[in-house]
Amino acid sequence: MRKSEFNAKSCFLMIGICVFNLNSSSCIIKTNAEHCSKRLFSFCYLGVGVIKKPLHLGNRKNMLFLSFLLVCLCEEVQMLNLTTTEVSATEFASIASKNMETNVSTSSDYLTGKSETTFSANPETWGKNVTEISIASVAYLNQSSMVTSTLAVGTTNRSSGNNVNVTTSSFPTVKGDEAQDIETFFTVILASTLSDVSEKTPQGLPTKSTPKKTVQALWETDTVQVPELTDTNEGDEEYFKDFLSSLVIWICGISFVGAFIIVIVILYNWYKKDKQRSLLWDEENKPDVQIRRDAKTCR
């Protein structure tokens, strides 16, 4: 690879990393979609250094550059799958109906990003024959400088009992080592019932009973305290283990892909040389070549 080409790729790499770090370190972000679009733009800009010039797979620097870009893109795709559009606290406050007779408890693993929520619906409130409830749960940090995230939507069946477990796959990002207060809200977006619940419906909900009736309501959990990550040795150890396991998986994956490409290149070169050898052998064994060789021998 020419020196000028290497310098151009190095410049694109450094500029892309700088833009990526600036976007990642921004504290006040309106929506997760905007945040992800900025990060993807950074990686597209970073990839110009690869697309602009033709790459030679045999060059180790190019292979390292491609591996780095592949890991970054995979991380971005994973982040896009975990984030959705957030709902602000003011929107929830405008539709809040806080007289729901429910008890909500939340247990969250802030290192793995998973949260499990259990709520007990009072039979006198909801009726005994409510068959299905869909829940959209949202958690946000109570500081405007923190990044927010919308949790996943869970569907559950209450036909077997009143306790309902909801497991979500993402949680707001906690920046810094200080303890933060997180307020979590759960919105009932769909409740189907087959019985008359006109006398058992909480205040603010529809009072008419119809088959497969849809109701909307919201209730608020207590504020939960996020532990200080640096003070939890066990949590730090688990985080370190997860980091090591992810690192090993990435290294093994990149090594496998690299080895596969190397094998393909070796087989292609072997096939190319064998074909050239075969053509040379056929050329030497042609009748006119053999006659000229015999004539030279007779002289």
From Swiss-Prot:
Coiled coil location: none
Name of this chain's protein: Protein U23
Membrane topology reported for the UniProt record: Single-pass membrane protein
Listed transmembrane segments: 247-267
Cell compartment(s), UniProt: Host membrane
Signal peptide (UniProt feature, chain positions): 1-27
Entry annotated with the keyword Signal: yes
Transmembrane among keywords: yes
